[in-house]
C-alpha cells in the first residue's frame, strides 16, 4: 500500500482469527541451535547472509511497529541445553564466526538448571494480535474480503468461492502450504498448537 500498489486481501475466515492474543511474540535471529549445522552444510558466507537477513527483519519490525503505533520491546534471546554443554559451545563459536555478538550465559529465572546457554541481545518481542490489528487498521476496508476462501490457482488467477480474482502478482501468506508445489512442503510439514496454564497454589515445577 505504501508503494501505491492496488491490492486485495482475502481470508477464508476472519482476519487474525487464528492469532494468539496477549502473548509474547518472539522476533529473533536465534532459531534454536542451528548455526553450527548451517555452516557445515552451506558455508560461513551463506550462513552469515541468513543471519544478517534475520537481523534486518528485526529492524524492519521495529520500523513498522513505530509507523503503525504498535508496541515492541527489546529483549535478549537464549538457546540452552540442560545436558549438552558442548553443543551450546559449538553454537556460540558458530555465532561468533558469522559476526553475531553472542555470549555464553546462564538462563536467569528458569526453575531448572541448564548445562550451558547462548545469549543474543538486540532481539525483540511484541503482541502479534496487536500488531496485526494495527497494520490492518491502516488498510482501506473495501480492499479486505473476509470469509473468502481461495480454492484454486491458475497462474495469477485466484479462484475463490465468491468469484475470480486476477492480479499481476499473487502472495500466498498462509502458515501452511495451500498449493501442492514448490517442494511438496505439505508432505513435510505438520500443524502444532501449544497451550500454557497459569495455576494458583500449584506445586513448583
Q: Which ranges hold each PLM region?
A:
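Flavin (FAD/FMN) cofactor-binding and adjacent substrate-gating region
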Residues: 33-40, 62-134
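A non-catalytic, amphipathic alpha-helix used as a structural packing/dimerization or gating element
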Residues: 45, 49-63, 90
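Hydrophobic anchor at the start of a short beta-strand
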Residues: 5-7, 102, 170
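Glycine-rich active-site loop/strand segments that organize a redox cofactor
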Residues: 22-53
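Glycine-rich FAD pyrophosphate-binding loop
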Residues: 2-22
Amino acid at each position: 500500500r505504501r508503494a501505491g500498489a492496488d491490492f486485495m486481501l482475502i481470508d477464508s475466515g476472519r482476519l487474525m482469527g487464528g492469532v494468539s492474543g496477549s502473548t509474547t511474540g518472539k522476533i529473533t535471529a536465534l532459531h534454536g541451535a542451528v548455526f553450527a549445522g548451517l555452516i557445515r552444510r552451506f558455508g560461513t558466507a551463506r550462513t552469515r547472509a541468513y543471519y544478517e537477513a534475520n537481523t534486518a527483519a528485526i529492524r524492519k519490525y521495529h520500523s513498522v511497529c513505530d509507523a503503525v503505533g504498535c508496541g515492541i520491546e527489546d529483549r535478549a534471546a537464549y538457546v540452552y541445553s540442560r545436558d549438552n554443554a558442548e553443543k551450546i559451545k559449538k553454537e556460540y563459536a558458530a555465532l561468533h564466526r558469522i559476526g553475531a555478538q553472542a555470549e555464553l550465559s546462564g538462563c536467569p529465572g528458569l526453575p531448572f538448571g541448564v548445562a550451558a546457554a547462548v545469549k543474543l541481545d538486540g532481539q525483540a518481542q511484541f503482541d502479534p494480535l496487536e500488531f496485526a490489528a494495527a497494520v490492518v487498521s491502516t488498510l482501506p476496508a473495501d480492499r479486505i474480503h473476509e470469509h473468502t476462501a481461495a480454492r484454486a490457482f491458475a497462474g495469477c488467477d485466484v479462484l475463490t468461492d465468491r468469484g475470480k480474482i486476477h492480479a499481476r502478482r499473487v502472495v500466498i501468506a498462509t502458515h501452511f502450504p495451500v498449493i501442492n508445489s514448490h517442494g511438496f512442503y505439505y508432505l513435510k510439514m505438520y500443524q502444532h498448537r501449544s497451550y500454557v496454564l497459569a495455576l494458583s497454589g500449584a506445586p513448583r515445577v
